[in-house]
């Protein structure tokens, strides 16, 4: 999986990051190639069940809420063996689900975490040469790089401590020749960039408040420059991903965050969840503290914002689901609610969108497929037959969903 041209473009900064340089058929990191849950594919399945349209399913040991990633002919997923105190990464053959390699890393797992968390909630990332995983070993944030083809460990490092009574969930975000990790915690927080090939630290910045959050940062191109946008630590902030320099900051709108923001129609759109819940949009072109000047709207309402699920967008509309299962469509520039409907019960997974359809997966494994439009139209509800917490991955006409016990590949064989 060389693709030298794509990699050289990414390293030169022609496009935002390593994930953005991945081929359109790949889903190489959290929420896909742009980190926003959007796929350009047009031939995804709309109907399945445990007995229908399942290309394969592979048993996954242990417990984990991380999402699968797909690159070329490989699928990767992480899990944790709580009793054995091991963090596990598996590499599967994408056409069959056959196990290609597995690596188990001993880790002192945190004894008490939130009931909706797991010891393997961070989604891995890959560039086709290395696979990066993130987990806690005692109080150490631990990053390991494995060889894509063989699974051999290439490097291991501890960027810092992580103190969070609810556990850990910081997914690795590739950018050019770096990987970037959020270290918001109940102590001195940090945002750190490591050289992807070696694990050597490139830059580090302190976060403003000692408050845990669980968000993956998102890389976006704004007004001709790359920005890394991160919610957490009682704020939303934009950074220069090459240097870590703070570009702008908005105070609040709440204390703790799990969902990741998205960028559309020249605005940063985000949901937030504890203790306040709502939907917020920010103009990311300002400098310094822009709380009073660049917040386009802030709608504080529990049914409008997801604490855990991130938003997704198609065309000029944004789609959100609350943790309690209320799906909605909104205007991202004004916050005006277009429609709101119940989509099952509790949701942890972030929705994905492709070919004019939004795929909402609830915790029971039901997938609510809705037209990505300003008029609500439920296309179909499909049952997987297994609880799920991770977000779907999309690749080459197939949908990959991680259940409580299996990884499912949905679509034609």
Give short role names for the model-derived ranges.
Residues 22-413:
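Noncatalytic, solvent-exposed loop/strand surfaces
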Residues 1-12, 17, 21:
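Bacterial N-terminal signal peptides that target proteins for export
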